[in-house]
Each structure stands twice: as C-alpha cells, then as structure tokens.
C-alpha cells in the first residue's frame, strides 16, 4: 500500500490525532542514498516526524524542515516535508552500522542514541507568509519520537504524545510510520483531556508492533489506541491523502546554482572539464551542465 496520512479527532474534538505511514518513502530513500538498515530507520523516523509536524499547517504549500546537528557517527540529518505529503531528506553517513542494543529479554533495538550522539534538533516551519518560525531543542535520546515530543513541549507548549517506529525483517523495512496525539490549544487546560491522553498512551506497549499489526490500515491503528475517535472528523480527503518521497530539484535549479559561481570559477570549469555535474543532496539525482550552457551563463 502507498504511504499516506490520516487526520482525526477524539474526545468530542478535544484531541487531535494524526497517523502517517512512511514505509515506501523510507525504502525509496534507502535505494537512492544506499542507506544501511540503521540509517534507513533513522531517516524513516525523521520522515514520519516531519510529516506529522507539517500535517497541522494551514496552507497546503507549507513546509517543515527538520535538522539534527550532533556529534554522533551518523553525522546529522536533514529532512524537508510538506503539508502536501511530499518528503525528502538525507543523513551525513549513509553507511553507518552499529551493534544492536539489548532492551529486554531476547529483544534488541538499533542504537539510535549512539548513532546520533549529543546535539540539537532544529525545526523550521515555513508557511510561505512572513518569516519562517525556527526553534531548537537538545536531543533527548536520538530515537526521534522523544526528541519531537521535547520540541512540542518546549516550543509549542502543547500536551502531546509522539510514537514513531518501524518493523525490520531480513529482507529490510516492512513498515515505518508514526502517530501524533495532541490536546488542542483551546482545550489544553482541561485536566480531563490531558489525563485521557496520558491514559491512552500508557496502553501502548510497542508502537512498532501495533503499526505492523494494523497492516497499513492507519484508521485501525488510531481506533485501537483511541476507541472514542470522532468518526465524523474523518473526511474522504483525509483518508486518501498520499505521502511520497518527492524532490524539488530540477535542471533549471541546477543552472540557477551555477549562476551563483564567480565568472572565474565558471571559466576554470570550462578549461579543466568542459562541463559540470551537479548531484542533489536530497535525492542523488544528477544534472549535467554542458559546455554551451556554462558558456551562456558566463556571457549573460
């Protein structure tokens, strides 16, 4: 099934719910960047986190940029996601693999904490109107979900719960996604709603397992956690909004990037190579700028 996002409310409109599936987007990123399993999981989690944040934006062309700057061997990451469901991103060290860490009897997990190390999560919300809103928080433990929850608590001061996970088998990632539950701003002083949110979240023992068992049915996933979901809040449009790995790069953007170079630099490229190849960091697409195109930039 294609990746998608579903929005709903519970408790008579007091709690906002968003669930996202990012399996195919994560696999596409793995293929394009040659990611290890560990890097695939971390980038997939960042995809889910950024899409969950972007889902609350009022304007369809609104975007969220999520950047991690840290001292871990992953060497950080950058993700760009839109309210339209388009997401792209990359990590600093795509080949990184670390030993699994034991989290319980016969249960192991990827070492997200050591992969990212200590550092900061930077979130930029850009609605396309006025200046983008930027906020930075320290990384909590590198599993992305708790890092995002920390951002929501400190920057938006909204009672929130964030769950992000994935299921891995020998053949690779078989599911990846996330869930965001928030008490809506006008209701955030209601102790009963905050208590309800806490109670529902305590019932989640393993979000990754719940995601897998839902078999890509996000409505089923939400209902299992919030049985008091408001069915009227789920529109057909919300049910069917697709999510996909999609980059904004193009030959035109590459030519514009070349125009930023000094005339002497362009002349040096013509003299040494006769052409230039630009590679997009987000998707690894390659764009060849030939001799005539570079010459035209110099002359104009």
From Swiss-Prot:
SUPFAM superfamilies: Hsp33 domain (SSF64397), HSP33 redox switch-like (SSF118352). GO terms for biological process: protein refolding. InterPro entries: Heat_shock_Hsp33, Heat_shock_Hsp33_C, Heat_shock_Hsp33_N. One of its GO terms (molecular function) is unfolded protein binding. It holds the Pfam family HSP33. Under oxidizing conditions two disulfide bonds are formed involving the reactive cysteines. Under reducing conditions zinc is bound to the reactive cysteines and the protein is inactive. One of its GO terms (cellular component) is cytoplasm. It comes from the Bacteria. It is found in: Cytoplasm. Keywords: Chaperone, Cytoplasm, Disulfide bond, Redox-active center, Zinc. Disulfide bonds join 247-249, 280-283. Belongs to the HSP33 family. PANTHER family: 33 KDA CHAPERONIN. HAMAP family: HslO. Redox regulated molecular chaperone. Protects both thermally unfolding and oxidatively damaged proteins from irreversible aggregation. Plays an important role in the bacterial defense system toward oxidative stress. This is 33 kDa chaperonin. It comes from Prochlorococcus marinus (strain MIT 9215).
